[in-house]
């Protein structure tokens, strides 16, 4: 009897090929992780960008201080006025010469006169044309250059807003007994043209100056705009008003992580809270004073 051999093949079944790539669930997990990481990184990047702008702004202010000191050295130890006299305004309406124009020959880098922290909304109302870039009248051209965002401590350094026969005020550098504690130039947001409903810097109001928290009385120009020879007889702030009128004051701007960038008369730059600059406590309480503005670092003097 024949036997038949049957050949058996114990072969493994072919493996089912796994599709390449990620599954939908894996993709969703990866996307979620990326979203979490982005959410963690973006605020840090935003803070880093703000810090870089603040550092650039402090550098600008140091260079402006150099230009200002060179001007003072070249003008018998006297500071420039915040603006040219009203009597010097031309019939053609050419922009008046401002403090930035006065010191420009000594610091001819236009970029340092414009704050890197101005927002897109702020820039149109916070910028002033350099007078030397506007030829014969008020028409601005492609050659017109601008400065903006920085204000001058005009009530204690140089104020030409003196009507009624009162002489313009120009401080002597040697009269400032506390140069390391006297504001020279800093971030400003301008004034509100006397109307609380207006934006700061409305219609270019006070966008190139800074007012102290209290109007000057016995020191400096003895007021923003004096109406007589009596000390303090006149306005407290750039747009008029009396002490404490925020709508009239050309106010410091806390553009740098909640701080005001500024440079002092001795040339060093700092970032201060508005409250500290105005002599208030960190919570904003207490009576303001002009110690960091008046040249003598004395809170009792104005």
Give, region by region, the residue ranges found by the protein language model.
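N-terminal leader/signal peptides at the extreme start of proteins
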Residues: 1-24
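Sequence-pattern detector for short linear motifs
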Residues: 8, 16, 50-52, 56, ...
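Amphipathic alpha-helical segments typified by the pilin-like N-terminal helix
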Residues: 20-59
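Short, flexible active-site loop motifs that bind/organize anionic cofactors or intermediates
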Residues: 17, 35, 54, 102, ...
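N-terminal cationic amphipathic segment used for targeting or macromolecule association
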Residues: 13-15, 30, 36, 42, ...
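Short, well-structured segments within or immediately adjacent to enzyme catalytic domains
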Residues: 57-58, 62-302
